[in-house]
Regions:
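Short, aromatic-rich amphipathic segments at membrane interfaces
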Residues: 130-138
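Cytosolic juxtamembrane segments of membrane proteins
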Residues: 55-62, 72, 196-210
Length: 260
């Protein structure tokens, strides 16, 4: 058979560049389609967050009090002044909030979403107090970078027969979907820890239990966003890898495929 080769007693035929190109295109389309499901995970959170604008006054005083109650003020943590948010539209319009580790500022519009502030204070506690939270915080961005890198690795061609010995790169190619998922877990865990600490902090300020119950519901939806991102990233990368494996790995020739 033309262009075929033997390995370990089996006959194989390399895949053509056309096969690999088809795999690349299909893998890219499937990956994009899977990643397109992300808004379904974030919508429950964003929808409730907008509704919380109307009840902001119920949380604002307790949140501002929480910085002292937690001792974060002694660590230099501050709530960013309103003018600081003018160039950050998501935070300014109450669509998001975040804790900046570099300047120790909680970026939040306290006239709109103070309910989210306790969670951001939880991020500050992770960053400044304790070992596990700080470690997870440091692992977030490297983990997300690795997950993104796995998206590229998934599109690499598979030039070895399935039965050939595997090296480190082969292992990464074969498991890039799992690696992408695991790489996102530090973000999920750190977010969950921040919410847990935020709820505990809210109780210390004397916030009423019905309000805390509502807060926990919001934070659970926020965690769903991050958990969904991890699952979707793993599935998208894994699907791309399987497609490229199918289209680019050398094909074993069976006896019934050989014509004389």
């Amino acid at each position: 058979m033309v262009n075929s080769f033997y390995y370990d007693g089996n006959q194989y035929i390399p895949r053509t560049q056309s096969d690999s190109s088809k795999g690349f295109i299909l893998a890219s389309l499937v990956s994009s389609a899977i990643m397109g499901t992300l808004p379904a995970f974030s919508k429950p959170f964003s929808t409730q967050l907008v509704k919380e604008h109307y009840d902001n006054y119920l949380y604002k005083d307790a949140f501002e009090k929480s910085i002292k109650v937690s001792g974060l003020d002694k660590k230099g943590v501050q709530i960013a002044p309103a003018q600081f948010l003018k160039d950050r539209s998501p935070e300014f319009f109450g669509q998001n909030a975040c804790y900046n580790t570099e300047n120790k500022k909680i970026l939040i519009n306290t006239d709109k979403i103070s309910i989210a502030g306790f969670h951001e204070a939880g991020h500050a506690l992770n960053d400044l107090k304790g070992i596990s939270g700080k470690l997870l915080s440091k692992m977030r961005w490297p983990g997300r970078a690795v997950a993104g890198l796995m998206g590229y690795v998934a599109l690499f061609q598979r030039t070895k027969p399935k039965e050939a010995p595997r090296d480190k790169m082969d292992f990464i190619k074969d498991n890039c979907g799992k690696i992408a998922f695991v790489s996102m877990l530090p973000t999920v865990l750190e977010e969950g820890m921040a919410s847990y600490k935020g709820v505990k902090l809210a109780r210390k300020t004397g916030l009423a239990e019905p309000l805390i119950k509502n807060m926990k519901k919001l934070y659970a939806k926020a965690l769903l966003t991050y958990a969904g991102h991890a699952v979707v990233a793993g599935l998208a990368v894994g699907a791309s890898s399987m497609i490229m494996d199918y289209f680019s790995r050398p094909k074993k020739i069976k006896d019934e495929d050989i014509f004389y």
